[in-house]
Amino acid sequence: MVLKITLSMDDMHTFHLNDGRNVNELNPKELLLYAAADCAGRTIVALLKEHISDVKLLELTLKGTLSTPSVVAESRFTSFNIIYHAECRALKEQLTISRALNLAHDKYCGLLQMLRRIAPLSHEISIVTTD
């Protein structure tokens, strides 16, 4: 079974669930995914503030594959995949955003580092310029 959490950044640089659910409605395994995606998002925002880069949209989707066909106490994560999707206004910002995404993923987000100790963590990056 695959659990999936998608977070989007609002104008105030706060992340929210995309599916309309409240955090209180998530099961503990989904909460783990939520916390890791939120940590990565906050880390990216902090890195981008240093470079005064303008991200129009930032969305993170974190998927976790479970060892069982349904969520039960014995379920263990066997792999994780995080998809970063960003939109910026200028082509020159793509490099800065890409660097921030990679730094957050590889080095600065402590919860992603923790997930790596549980199971393999892969990632995908999509950056689109809207101008």
Annotate each PLM feature:
Residues 1-35, 42-131:
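Extended beta-strand/beta-hairpin segments
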